[in-house]
């Protein structure tokens, strides 16, 4: 006893969990050391101990044992945040649908996988004896994936078609599912319940086919004598140690293993765990092992090539049916895994790429010539490295070098600052042999009706040249311009022309906007701008139907008129400012008193940019002359008429100018207020005509009166006018002189009226005679406005001082004029103000009498000046010479070929290309006479446009004059082709004035055929991006600024604005500076100005100086190779197919969906798509190698190499599927199956052999031997058969007939006269004969036969001593030895082959 205690004291105590793998290893070691009998005794004790412990522990599973992982909440939130950002990018058109789906799947897969990995550590720390933890992680019941569904999250699922549902199930089964999640889960449940039976039968059928193909493979001899093997190396690190050990265990060495001069192991020695550990420890040379692939026996296998038996750990015995064992070993896990089904929705990509992270903070540098820009598979901008790239990260005192391997994506820009552990590159995992891929088509459908536009060239696919299917050559946007198409079956006769106004109530428009004019508000008016119906209707001379006025849609170049002020019986279209740009100037500082209306100064410029003498330059709306509501203006009295010569406002060629005319001199303006409601004809009115009402009386269902007084109701054809007059009523009986007056205005302070002292502001007397009643007089209050003369007004108080600086020969005068005619009623609605008096700034200049012709007009243009990084805007007014001088200069051959002003010509430069210093600006100012004023006036805090009147400044743009005066007959010389332009000098000749943008009448541009490349060369400024944006944001602007009109009857209209408008807020916009041009497409998240709202995506259809009108459009991003359905400008309806993506998708290796994947490998169906180039390369290589080595050796080597490579690849693929499910299958079993799949070659038609006919399948060994025997080449190529086809191409027709197609196989065999030698197991079972296998096989062989065999073995060895390893260089020796070889081995095979054929 003491001895026993002492021995126990010396034993090592292991306190570790023994799982299934550890238990397997322990039993192997026990068998090696103690043998079978002793090991079984030990295992009985272990079993008894296990049952005893399980009974005493009595583990049971309750719902309280399911503890959710604490980190789940923030992990899911993080994934949701990423998904939200992704959705935004998709909406903006930065990523397309496939990239979104792919990224969404990976986000949720990574989250789910991380949660799964968290389970074990979480349980180990918080509750190590949790029953769920003990059961699942010991392998006793369930696996990690099932527990993950209980306490982690269910994750992504697949729909019945096997497609991913990108909405993940975030809950786990412990928390319970929401209704949506439950419905998504139902797909998986159906798979689990219904498919289990189907899948079990699938797994059973797979097992049957596997057994069928290898049932005749039996261990027949000890050693086949092969010298070939497969080499494995523990050094290269490509193979994990676990896989390396598993591959080596139980194998037999094909060669001696040396470390230096010491022999570690010898040939034909079987490998145990001790030898494997020594190999790993000593890092031995590549180890060559024997496998079933290298066995020389055709129909069976030898002991050494098979290795150890999996049952007892010794070399396999003779007569063992290893083929059937292999088939069942592979088929059985499929059955087992089907029964414990688990669904991840087909996401077993494991394809989260490896990342390279920055070692420290610092600035990154790399050689930009070695990379080129691309998109990652998630749609992010990146750089692709074609070769190894060395990246340097400079921190304060240290340089880090990082090597980026080839074909990786670099996710940062050069000179970008990166933080420690930031992902800087993504290493592309070689997925060619890893994953199963399939090509999937994804159709994208239109979300709305609209018109299709492309922003880049699209090629016709060759097979659809006359159809509407197109292929995209490069990444670009596809735009659907929203609009309501007319779906009427009848084609209506249309008189509409482009850009016409249209009534929105017209029947060809699908939707309507109805609103009551008396309650018009700003949101209603905003609807018109956001409305995407730009219809067309013939212009009316008069609009009498006021209720439709709010539906006038703004298109083309008409400024929008808001119907706040209606002039009775006036033509609305003539009042519209068709030919003006309005530039409102607003103060930076908000007014302190919010209630005071802000006074607005607007600069008014004609659209053709030309001022004539006495033109209005700016106007000022004085808030004192602003009035809310309706009323009647009066500025003449019955007693006082003084006629004075005064200037009147007239229209002349679209330009407002003052001309002398006789008109009443007005010093006071009277306004008689009244409340007016214009109602639809169908309105129900709750007050009577000619009645008196009080304040806040109900007039209609939703209108109340604002004032009290006398009601007058007038019913007209299409509307009702309801007027309320406030005031006092006087009947004629009263002793009042007022009653004598009728419809007269009595001004205040009239000396001969005693009663007028009561009325401080004067009164308006109106006589009213109701039907059959006495008349009475209504005395209405009057508001008086004093109008000061324009000469006495101080300009500085009204206009910004910057407009009134010292100027060269430019005069400015102030003129007041009244906006309304005398006695004309004003109809104001919805609390909007009516401006009664406007103060104008009239522009004039000194005209030299000698050169009067040359200064009739002044030309306005915008100038942009950039100084010290600040961009400033100016308005420049140049005096223009007469057109005759231009034509003369243009046609003068001695001239420069270009119209010029003071010889400087017109020039252009990119405003971003140069930044001027103060010194240079001063220097330029000395050269160019004229004044430039700074943008900010520090005293007043105003910001405004400046007027530069330097007549000798260089002027922009030939379009104003060349086209204007040569429109009819003279052909236009296009800028792009003009040889006289000194392009190199463009940047230097303009000085500090930057680019001047001419304001021209763009109607005349319609006949230009090509674009002016010089003027449209500034697209996007990227200087500030590097400083302000750490996040890379690429916006795809439109590449094609042309406008195509889809109407076939009209001409194609090119970009009418051949320049680009820059929009800046008054403070310099650092974020971005896009250029807005007409017809351009804008993505939604592009910022136009700082603090400005982000625009919705769309196409610019109207550019004004301070605003842009955008037609809503939806962008769809498409990558190269995408198919586009439909033509440019085609009208599409909701639900139509827009584009089709073709992309590769990693298919699931999950066994429930993945069992078919294993089957596909065994059946050798096409899994990965092979490129055409690769196939051509292989064919070329085959031709070359046969030419170099000669016919017999070319075919032999080509077929051998192909077969060896495909065998290894197939084994790896099958193992990967099973390992992903945690199933361990020894490589030997798979190798036996794959050997049978790849054992045949196909006789080719290149050469007619005497023995085989073309297209015949023969064994590779047989083809080699027959070629040697006949001394002529047999032309053949390698072929992969698949298990079903291999089962139907064996040496036994009885075996084939019992598998499939019985009648066909038997009929064919009878016609050919085939003989079945009954070598295999199945044939003998069918015929009821003795089975030719079993481990008692060696006892049946007589000793004499055994002796003969041994003598033959020695003879064979002597004959093969001359056989060399390398068939490339020693083929003569090999050929001679093969010819002199004993025929014993081949006779039987040849005989069988001849009978087969």
Curated annotation (Swiss-Prot):
A GO CC term attached to the entry: chloroplast
Region (Disordered), start-end ranges: 502-521
BP terms from Gene Ontology: DNA-templated transcription
Cofactor details (free text): Binds 1 Zn(2+) ion per subunit.
The protein, known as: DNA-directed RNA polymerase subunit beta''
Subunit structure: In plastids the minimal PEP RNA polymerase catalytic core is composed of four subunits: alpha, beta, beta', and beta''. When a (nuclear-encoded) sigma factor is associated with the core the holoenzyme is formed, which can initiate transcription.
EC number from the UniProt entry: 2.7.7.6
The keyword Zinc is annotated on this UniProt entry: yes
Residues annotated to bind Zn(2+): 224, 295, 302, 305
Entry similarity comment: Belongs to the RNA polymerase beta' chain family. RpoC2 subfamily.
PANTHER family according to UniProt: DNA-DIRECTED RNA POLYMERASE SUBUNIT BETA
Keywords assigned by UniProt, alphabetized: Chloroplast, DNA-directed RNA polymerase, Metal-binding, Nucleotidyltransferase, Plastid, Transcription, Transferase, Zinc
Organism: Jasminum nudiflorum (Winter jasmine)
Cofactors required: Zn(2+)
Enzyme class: transferase
